[in-house]
Amino acid sequence: MLALLTAGVALAVAAGQAQDNPIPGSRFVCTALPPEAARAGCPLPAMPMQGGALSPEEELRAAVLHWRETVVQQKETLGAQREAIRELTSKLARCEGLAGGKARGTGATGKDTMGDLPRDPGHVVEQLSRSLQTLKDRLESLELQLHTNASNAGLPSDFREVLQRRLGELERQLLRKVAELEDEKSLLHNETSAHRQKTENTLNALLQRVTELERGNSAFKSPDAFKVSLPLRTNYLYGKIKKTLPELYAFTICLWLRSSASPGIGTPFSYAVPGQANEIVLIEWGNNPIELLINDKVAQLPLFVSDGKWHHICITWTTRDGMWEAFQDGEKLGTGENLAPWHPIKPGGVLILGQEQDTVGGRFDATQAFVGELSQFNIWDRVLRAQEIINIANCSTNMPGNIIPWVDNNVDVFGGASKWPVETCEERLLDL
């Protein structure tokens, strides 16, 4: 205190001397300094003291100036929050229009930006909910900061009440928006569930109708006088042979087929066993030639049946040296060996018509599907003689397979595939 008084006296004396002896052309410049600079080395003149403290008027004036700046800052913050709420309200109105199904066309395209809400109503609601929750958190943080500042600086009660009331109004508006969004989200969920249930009911009705049609076509003139129709290249239309194969050391497979696809007829049949999906497969994929796969080993067959006409094909194979033969319309077009030699065909697998299996009984690929009609699919456990194959192909004899015969009650169809009465053998010959 003594030092301050001494400094004040010295300052007063210097000022008096300056007045008595002014320096020509000189002037005094007053510059405002921050409190830190004053404390560091520029002491200010002592303010009038009364009992060692500021007067009530000066204390109130300082508090009012401080909180006037605080109120200006809070107004700016509240203005920014008001703009954010206005923007979110606008987006909510757009969301409500979208929920009614009339705001947008199904063919529109766009990106999910702040000006272009996502197409999925659920995503819209979730995005707005997150935005409102963020705004609420910011308001709560602002309110907490306000309480802290008020407790530290002694904010006048009228200012505190005004700000508290304004924050309360904003919070209530925010809670109302959140409640509206929750109701909207629940409504959209209910509408989506109802639409999904309606779709499932429609699909079930169609499936039941297809099943009725399939059953209605089961009365054929004879058990083998039918064909399996696979009209589309999909991964769900197929036929399934109920019986499975025993262990085989030789076989002959014959069938009639008429392909509706080009290039590549797809997969007329496939046989898969656990551990080997390509135990026996006949496939023509893309522009590749027809291939016979046995135990995933490949032989290319010189067969050409993708002209949309009925064709009779037979394939023989024996484990001895892997010998194979390929017949088309009764004529032997190719032969070879070393196709999975000394490998017996494994028993207990699944035999599928029209699809290539990647796992036993499933994982079909639409690009490898057969499109067209199949009939008279028979399997024998031996290599048929060439004359026997000719007689079957020219309708001279009816010779069912002794392992897999072509009969109605041994073939199931799925996914929209169907069974229909087949043309007579003579009619198929005329189509060649």
UniProtKB/Swiss-Prot annotation:
GO terms for molecular function: carbohydrate binding; metal ion binding. Ca(2+) 2 binds at E356, D358, Q368. Glycans are attached at N149, N190, N394. Pfam families: Pentaxin. GO terms for biological process: associative learning; neurotransmitter receptor localization to postsynaptic specialization membrane. Residues 1-14 form the signal peptide. Induction: Rapidly induced in neurons of the hippocampus and cortex by physiological synaptic activity. Ca(2+) 1 binds at N278, E356, Q357, D358. Keywords: Calcium, Disulfide bond, Glycoprotein, Lectin, Metal-binding, Secreted, Signal. Its cofactor is Ca(2+). Residues 224-425 form the Pentraxin (PTX) domain. Disulfide bonds join C254-C314. GO terms for cellular component: extrinsic component of postsynaptic specialization membrane; glutamatergic synapse; presynapse; synapse; synaptic cleft. Likely to play role in the modification of cellular properties that underlie long-term plasticity. Binds to agar matrix in a calcium-dependent manner. Homooligomer or heterooligomer (probably pentamer) with neuronal pentraxin receptor (NPTXR). PANTHER family: NEURONAL PENTRAXIN-2, PENTRAXIN. This is Neuronal pentraxin-2. It comes from Rattus norvegicus. The gene is Nptx2.
